[in-house]
């Protein structure tokens, strides 16, 4: 059943034919608490190698009533990562390159996930010195010293659970700060 659902979801994705060789994707149905405090069931497409970790992490987040606005496949946003992030959509698989490079992102292998990306933007300095914020609507949440809801920090349950499961956090990177991003790049 999960394979059939995955096939149907990917049917509408322009990136389905770009899936890297040797990558097996899985579809997870993830219970979560939305920003209105209601239980929702989201759909997460990920690499089969991290499926069990993600199920355990999100089960703990759900039990703790940790708010996640939405969890939908990137195909619901016409494979547009910026559009998905602006909608504060938590997602995993997205066939794309790392911004500003020709290198495949770990999202393209389903080994990376972005959680509540609007409130936890990716911030990078481009070669011309300008600052790139993704999503572009995440500018109010760049200053991590400010107090605001849904912010991932090292004290946050979301951070702790992903780290306990062996993920690396983009908020710890030196040059780019990708506060929404967790990955297992070495699988």
Where are these regions (language model features)?
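Positively charged n-region of N-terminal signal peptides that target proteins for export
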Residues: 1-4
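Extracellular/periplasmic catalytic domains that process cell-envelope and extracellular macromolecules
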Residues: 21-24, 104-110, 163
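Active-site acidic/histidine clusters and adjacent loop/turn architecture
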Residues: 22-85
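Mid-length scaffold segments of soluble, non-membrane domains
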Residues: 83-118
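Catalytic cores and adjacent binding grooves of peptidoglycan-active enzymes
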Residues: 98-100, 113-187
């Amino acid at each position: 059943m999960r394979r059939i659902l995955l096939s149907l979801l990917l049917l509408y994705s322009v990136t389905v034919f770009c899936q890297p060789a040797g990558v097996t994707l899985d579809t997870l149905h993830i219970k979560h608490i939305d920003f209105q405090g209601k239980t929702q069931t989201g759909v997460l497409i990920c690499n089969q190698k991290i499926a069990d970790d993600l199920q355990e992490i999100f089960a703990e987040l759900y039990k703790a009533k940790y708010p996640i606005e939405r969890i939908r496949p990137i195909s619901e946003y016409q494979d547009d990562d910026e559009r998905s992030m602006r909608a504060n959509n938590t997602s995993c698989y997205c066939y794309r390159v790392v911004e500003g490079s020709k290198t495949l992102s770990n999202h393209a292998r389903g080994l990376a996930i972005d959680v509540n990306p609007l409130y936890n933007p990716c911030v990078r300095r481009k070669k011309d010195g300008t600052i790139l914020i993704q999503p572009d609507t995440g500018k109010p949440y760049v200053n991590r010293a400010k107090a605001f809801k849904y912010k991932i920090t090292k004290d946050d349950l979301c951070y702790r659970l992903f780290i306990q499961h062996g993920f690396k956090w983009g908020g710890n990177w030196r040059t780019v700060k990708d506060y929404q991003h967790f990955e297992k790049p070495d699988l």
